[in-house]
Swiss-Prot record:
One of its GO terms (molecular function) is zinc ion binding. Acts as an accessory subunit for the core Polycomb repressive complex 2 (PRC2), which mediates histone H3K27 (H3K27me3) trimethylation on chromatin leading to transcriptional repression of the affected target gene. Plays a role in nucleosome localization of the PRC2 complex. Belongs to the AEBP2/jing C2H2-type zinc-finger family. The gene is AEBP2. Residues 371-386 have a biased composition (Basic residues). Residues 36-50, 87-114 have a biased composition (Acidic residues). It comes from Bos taurus. The modification N-acetylalanine is found at residue 2. Self-associates. Associates with the PRC2 complex, which consists of the core components EED, EZH1 or EZH2, SUZ12, and RBBP4, and various combinations of accessory subunits including AEBP2, JARID2, PHF19, MTF2 and EPOP. Found in a monomeric PRC2.2 (class 2) complex consisting of at least SUZ12, RBBP4, AEBP2 and JARID2. Within the PRC2 complex, interacts directly with SUZ12; competes with PHF19 for SUZ12 binding. Interacts with EED, EZH2, and RBBP4. May also interact with RBBP7. A zinc finger (C2H2-type) spans 255-280, 294-316, 322-346. One of its GO terms (biological process) is regulation of transcription by RNA polymerase II. Residues 203-288 are annotated as: Interaction with RBBP4. Keywords: Acetylation, Chromatin regulator, DNA-binding, Metal-binding, Nucleus, Phosphoprotein, Repeat, Repressor, Transcription, Transcription regulation, Zinc, Zinc-finger. This is Zinc finger protein AEBP2. The lineage of its organism: Eukaryota, Metazoa, Chordata, Craniata, Vertebrata.
Amino acid sequence: MAAALTDMADLEELSRLSPLPPGSPGPAARGRAEPPEEEEEEDEEEEAEAEAVAALLLNGGGGGGGVGGGEAETMSEPSPESASQAGEDDDEEEDDDEEEEDESSSGGGEEESSAESLVGSSSGGSSSDETRSLSPGAASSSSGDGDGKEGLEEPKGPRGSQGGGGGGSSSSSVVSSGGDEGYGTGGGGSSATSGGRRGSLEMSSDGEPLSRMDSEDSISSTIMDVDSTISSGRSTPAMMNGQGSTTSSSKNIAYNCCWDQCQACFTSSPDLADHIRSIHVDGQRGGVFVCLWKGCKVYNTPSTSQSWLQRHMLTHSGDKPFKCVVGGCNASFASQGGLARHVPTHFSQQNSSKVSSQPKAKEESPSKAGMNKRRKLKNKRRRSLPRPHDFFDAQTLDAIRHRAICFNLSAHIESLGKGHSVVFHSTVIAKRKEDSGKIKLLLHWMPEDILPDVWVNESERHQLKTKVVHLSKLPKDTALLLDPNIYRTMPQKRLKRTLIRKVFNLYLSKQ
């Protein structure tokens, strides 16, 4: 046993001083030693077994444990914790190898079973008799303490898949090109150094080692938690340590004075309004007041009213000093007129709530277009409704009939003029004889004062006894003498009503 420990120390020192060839594992892959009783009983058999195994491993490119000086190291009984975690494609081979290892340990050193477990095992860890061997492409991990204590060999990461002739990563963190990449979850994906330092492993909360996939899942879940924390606006520890800072949602709004040659800036609208009122409005003298606000539509337009300028500047400052006096209402207005229009709405709402328990929302706050539409519908409905009082009674009908008869007797519109012409009758009021011997007669037309008197020959007297003239050809100034309703200036509705009445009177006169 002492000789075996001495050889182990010599091999470790040689591995430190001389570089190892690719594919050969360092002494960090050694396992636990068996008890002295087993070593003495099977010393000779295991020496031959170790030499055969070492030759097979070196010829096959696999990383076997360092065996030298003819001294063999005993193989420890495998424990559940000493089995390295393999990739997903090597699960079946790992189960078979574990069964073979159990048989070899229980059989007391059978050469064939131990050789198969050393050469064909796909689990991590380089070994001779003392440690379990790594298959080609696997990463070895250190387990030796250097003082003969039993050290548990645990994997640092998942092995690469077995490839033909590819060496695993050695104890000096050398990764061969024949196998897949070996990832270490603890210290950057390499095995422990040859100095016997124990590789760091990621341990779960219950003490079990984490595989590569478990570690990656935990890392990805941590990253997702951080992303969700940042997106939701919560402060992360990194932010609290100064690596990040949360910005406040509220921003200070600056109110700048845009008056010509004024660079004042305020933090609130009332302060800006006081500044404009005291400096720019009240400071103007001479009876002429102008607004010098940049971009104003009445820029530099003179006015004689200072109160107008004060009200106008409220549109620039945004201040609304006129607040509603009704309790519970927070409305404010830029002008007193707006406040005066707002206050009655509170009382109208109270009255409407008494009349109707469910007032319409549109009536409480109607738009201008809605008001005009309702007004038109209301007026249309009012015109269509029948009138409650009708003053066209029998007495009125008799008076209209009398006036129609008198008008017809004087103008003969209905009897001779067919309803649209006036019939004039002539009478001789004078007679004269000219120098040529002709006799002239002066005719006077009835109804009077409509047509002027005219001189005609005596031979034309018979033809001019009557004269029919259309109403449209009568002079307007004299046509009103027939009846005041002719050419009377009145609204269109009353004119239409009058014409209907005239037609009705004429119809009655025919009866």
